[in-house]
Amino acid sequence: MMATSIVGDILNSFILSGRLGYAEIFKSPVFWLCLILVVLAGLLAMPLAVPIGPMYWDTYIYLDATQRIKMGQIPGADFSTPVGPLGYYLFTAGLALFPKAQLLLLAQWSMLAAAAPLMAVVLGAIGPQRRALAFALLVPFLIFGIFPANVQAFHTYPGLDGFGIYNRQTSLLIYVLVSGLMFIREGRKLAVFCAIAKLCLFLTKITGFLVGGLIGLAALLAGRISVRSTILAAVLFLAVLAILELNGHMMTAYLADIARLVALNEEALLPRFLTVMSGKLDVILPSGLLVLAFSGST
């Protein structure tokens, strides 16, 4: 049903553009999204060489996971992984399609296979009447999705970052989720959209899933999504997890890995939290002051 909706949104966009003239096609944000995806696919088909920095352990983990998946092993059940299995399966499929692809770029861009269709739904929901708004959402999405670099610099060597891939992909999915909650009308379509977005977050990184849950709670309290749609999204989400569990107890193994990692890093959680808080103080402090000011004015 979601795939039909996505295809329908894209076709409706092009049909409407065709009626207005071929020049209108270039004004469609969905057209530019599809065009850039084609360009990225072309780049993956080429044997490119890019600097990935001295800290490239995440890129190596992708290669190890891909080799294990090709041997028939299941992430979580047969080998431990630091995050969810979605990124590894997308990378494995991408490597089969583009065997000459630059590995970091493939790892970074493979998540677009899940995020781009969801973003197309958001752009279709905005409609041609508000194209400026649609492009304002599309440009950051493409920047976050395409450029494999972290916000903070950990080394002085110029180049890209071969680590932190999961965090970048999680941020991209959260961006898509927030966009959908803001611009898709309340109803079944929004419920299915949220279920798929939350499923992608859960299967990518559990911390992103928790953040997405808080965002969903805020949307529920703000009236952007109804209780009925929330329940429908939760049912769809759990149904897919139940199906995935049949694949060698993948989900219970994934949750066991999460519990094991939390236990191993329990003593380091508070220092890491304080490190993140101090690193993002320029955002957290002004935001907190704005919340206090708004609360005081009301």
Question: Over which residues does each language-model region extend?
Answer:
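Specific aromatic-rich, kink-prone transmembrane helix
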Residues: 161-186, 191-193, 197
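Transmembrane alpha-helices of multi-pass, membrane-embedded glycan-processing enzymes
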Residues: 87, 91-98, 104-119, 167-173
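Membrane-interface alpha helices of multi-pass inner-membrane proteins
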Residues: 178, 190-206, 211-219, 237-241
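Transmembrane helix irregularities
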Residues: 97, 165-167, 200-207, 246-247
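Transmembrane catalytic cores of multi-pass membrane glycosyltransferases
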Residues: 42-62, 68-70, 79-86, 102-106, ...
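Start-transfer (signal-anchor) and selected internal transmembrane alpha helices
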Residues: 1-44, 131-137
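Transmembrane-helix motifs of polytopic, lipid-linked glycan transferases
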Residues: 106-145
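Aromatic- and kink-enriched transmembrane "portal" helix at the membrane-lumen/periplasm boundary
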Residues: 137-171
